[in-house]
């Protein structure tokens, strides 16, 4: 009989968001007349920008003609999309990238998992706590860890607590690690990192021959000009960092699927015999073997994001969500809750009232306010006692949800 990958059996219960979905479905079945407002999972609600829709239609029309038909494209992505991203999103930051250093994908969630293919299992990994669950769970799945302890920490992973005391910015590891996951603006805490803070991590990585996985999925929500959008704004980062970006929140592509990875040619690893080798070459080899490229219509739509018209239209959509974030943040603060995030990020990280557990507060909001959020403990042990709300809802629902919560907490 075929054997399973038993590392999957180490995973704790279900993935966070399916568990939330299960509880909400049970509540809805028992309370069919209740109007449930979902501010939990970070799915967007605004339609795609008109320029993006126009490009989508044109790309579909291309596929209907012999002259413009597009079959298999380059696995790494079309140059016209890669160059548009570099020109519009990186060069204004003072970051110069080669076309060969960027890879277009079908989403950054997959990229954050698949990048592990090109790293040896005996690398020591450091992740924040709380953290986007994909970072943790994918390392468990591939066999890098032992079993989880009573707190939920897996043997073989270095956890870096992100707490109120350290401003939700992890401290440098005291032990040597090989791979460091950083996410800024942060999911789930909504925290951002300054250039000075990121410089510490870059310096650590260079000094310890480590590689930083920098998740910049929410960089488009940064409004403070002093906050870096890319790890490559930091001197030396191209020697030690791989950056992930997503179109899901930047352009509303949660149902379209498109992302990108930047793997600079300078980021090096070592072979078992100690020879240096470029991770860029390995990722290209992995990509050409396991991926046929994002679809032609999707890449055409993504390119429209970087047109002048598409850029402005998407900015207006992002501004809409950030106004939602302001409404949530200020409304809950006025209700006496301690809140973080929601300024340069679309997530609000709040402290549960009265020392309530994260899941108890989830049940309280669902049952008493008919509002769905995300329990902080689902992101890791250090998230216990906290709760995440998303700014991606419809404006009227956001306003109503805040009013319900304020009324309930009086």
Swiss-Prot record:
<keyword id="KW-0032">Aminotransferase</keyword>
<dbReference type="GO" id="GO:0009089">
    <property type="term" value="P:lysine biosynthetic process via diaminopimelate"/>
</dbReference>
<comment type="pathway">
    <text>Amino-acid biosynthesis; L-lysine biosynthesis via DAP pathway; LL-2,6-diaminopimelate from (S)-tetrahydrodipicolinate (aminotransferase route): step 1/1.</text>
</comment>
<protein>
    <recommendedName>
        <fullName>LL-diaminopimelate aminotransferase</fullName>
        <ecNumber>2.6.1.83</ecNumber>
    </recommendedName>
</protein>
<comment type="function">
    <text>Involved in the synthesis of meso-diaminopimelate (m-DAP or DL-DAP), required for both lysine and peptidoglycan biosynthesis. Catalyzes the direct conversion of tetrahydrodipicolinate to LL-diaminopimelate.</text>
</comment>
<feature type="binding site">
    <location>
        <position position="388"/>
    </location>
    <ligand>
        <name>substrate</name>
    </ligand>
</feature>
<feature type="binding site">
    <location>
        <begin position="108"/>
        <end position="109"/>
    </location>
    <ligand>
        <name>pyridoxal 5'-phosphate</name>
    </ligand>
</feature>
<feature type="binding site">
    <location>
        <position position="132"/>
    </location>
    <ligand>
        <name>pyridoxal 5'-phosphate</name>
    </ligand>
</feature>
<feature type="binding site">
    <location>
        <position position="218"/>
    </location>
    <ligand>
        <name>pyridoxal 5'-phosphate</name>
    </ligand>
</feature>
<feature type="binding site">
    <location>
        <position position="109"/>
    </location>
    <ligand>
        <name>substrate</name>
    </ligand>
</feature>
<feature type="binding site">
    <location>
        <position position="15"/>
    </location>
    <ligand>
        <name>substrate</name>
    </ligand>
</feature>
<feature type="binding site">
    <location>
        <begin position="246"/>
        <end position="248"/>
    </location>
    <ligand>
        <name>pyridoxal 5'-phosphate</name>
    </ligand>
</feature>
<comment type="similarity">
    <text>Belongs to the class-I pyridoxal-phosphate-dependent aminotransferase family. LL-diaminopimelate aminotransferase subfamily.</text>
</comment>
<feature type="binding site">
    <location>
        <position position="132"/>
    </location>
    <ligand>
        <name>substrate</name>
    </ligand>
</feature>
<dbReference type="InterPro" id="IPR019942">
    <property type="entry name" value="DapL/ALD1"/>
</dbReference>
<feature type="binding site">
    <location>
        <position position="72"/>
    </location>
    <ligand>
        <name>pyridoxal 5'-phosphate</name>
    </ligand>
</feature>
<dbReference type="GO" id="GO:0030170">
    <property type="term" value="F:pyridoxal phosphate binding"/>
</dbReference>
<feature type="binding site">
    <location>
        <position position="187"/>
    </location>
    <ligand>
        <name>substrate</name>
    </ligand>
</feature>
<dbReference type="InterPro" id="IPR015421">
    <property type="entry name" value="PyrdxlP-dep_Trfase_major"/>
</dbReference>
<dbReference type="InterPro" id="IPR004839">
    <property type="entry name" value="Aminotransferase_I/II_large"/>
</dbReference>
<feature type="modified residue" description="N6-(pyridoxal phosphate)lysine">
    <location>
        <position position="249"/>
    </location>
</feature>
<feature type="binding site">
    <location>
        <position position="292"/>
    </location>
    <ligand>
        <name>substrate</name>
    </ligand>
</feature>
<feature type="binding site">
    <location>
        <position position="42"/>
    </location>
    <ligand>
        <name>substrate</name>
    </ligand>
</feature>
<dbReference type="InterPro" id="IPR015424">
    <property type="entry name" value="PyrdxlP-dep_Trfase"/>
</dbReference>
<dbReference type="GO" id="GO:0010285">
    <property type="term" value="F:L,L-diaminopimelate aminotransferase activity"/>
</dbReference>
<keyword id="KW-0808">Transferase</keyword>
<dbReference type="InterPro" id="IPR015422">
    <property type="entry name" value="PyrdxlP-dep_Trfase_small"/>
</dbReference>
<dbReference type="Pfam" id="PF00155">
    <property type="entry name" value="Aminotran_1_2"/>
</dbReference>
<feature type="binding site">
    <location>
        <position position="187"/>
    </location>
    <ligand>
        <name>pyridoxal 5'-phosphate</name>
    </ligand>
</feature>
<comment type="subunit">
    <text>Homodimer.</text>
</comment>
<keyword id="KW-0663">Pyridoxal phosphate</keyword>
<feature type="binding site">
    <location>
        <position position="292"/>
    </location>
    <ligand>
        <name>pyridoxal 5'-phosphate</name>
    </ligand>
</feature>
<feature type="binding site">
    <location>
        <position position="257"/>
    </location>
    <ligand>
        <name>pyridoxal 5'-phosphate</name>
    </ligand>
</feature>
């Amino acid at each position: 009989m075929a054997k399973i990958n038993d590392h999957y059996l180490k995973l704790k219960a279900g993935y966070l968001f399916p568990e939330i979905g299960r509880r909400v479905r049970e509540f809805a079945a028992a309370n069919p007349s209740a109007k449930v407002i979902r501010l939990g999972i970070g799915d967007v609600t605004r339609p795609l920008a008109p320029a993006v829709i126009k490009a989508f239609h044109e790309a579909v029309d291309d596929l209907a003609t012999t002259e413009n038909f597009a079959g298999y494209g380059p696995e790494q992505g079309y140059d016209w999309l890669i160059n548009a991203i570099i020109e519009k999103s990186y060069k204004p930051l003072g970051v110069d990238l080669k076309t060969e250093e960027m890879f277009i994908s079908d989403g950054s969630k997959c990229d954050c998992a698949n990048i592990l293919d090109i790293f040896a299992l005996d690398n020591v990994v450091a992740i924040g706590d709380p953290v986007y669950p994909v970072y943790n769970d994918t390392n468990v799945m591939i066999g890098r860890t032992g079993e989880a302890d009573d707190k939920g920490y897996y043997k073989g992973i270095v956890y870096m607590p992100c707490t109120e005391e350290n401003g939700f910015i992890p401290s440098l590891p005291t032990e040597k690690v090989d791979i460091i996951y950083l996410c800024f603006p942060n999911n789930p805490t909504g925290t951002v990192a300054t250039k000075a803070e990121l410089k510490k991590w870059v310096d650590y990585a260079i000094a310890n021959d480590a590689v930083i996985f920098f998740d910049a999925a929410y960089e488009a929500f940064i409004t403070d000009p002093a906050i870096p959008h890319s790890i490559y704004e930091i001197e030396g980062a191209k020697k030690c960092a791989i950056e992930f970006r997503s179109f899901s929140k930047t352009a509303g592509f949660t149902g379209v699927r498109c992302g990108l990875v930047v793997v600079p040619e300078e980021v090096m690893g070592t072979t078992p015999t100690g020879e240096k080798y470029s991770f860029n070459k390995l990722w290209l080899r992995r990509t050409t073997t396991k991926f046929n490229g994002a679809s032609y219509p999707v890449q055409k739509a993504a390119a429209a994001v970087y047109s002048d018209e598409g850029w402005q239209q998407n900015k207006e959509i992002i501004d809409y969500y950030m106004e939602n974030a302001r409404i949530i943040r200020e409304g809950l603060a006025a209700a006496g809750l301690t809140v973080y995030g929601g300024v340069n990020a679309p997530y609000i990280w709040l402290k549960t009232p009265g020392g309530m557990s994260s899941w108890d507060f989830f049940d309280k909001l669902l049952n008493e306010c008919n509002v769905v959020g995300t329990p902080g403990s689902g992101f890791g042990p250090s998230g216990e006692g906290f709760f995440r709300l998303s700014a991606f809802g419809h404006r009227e629902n956001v306003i109503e949800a805040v009013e319900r919560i304020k009324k309930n907490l009086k």
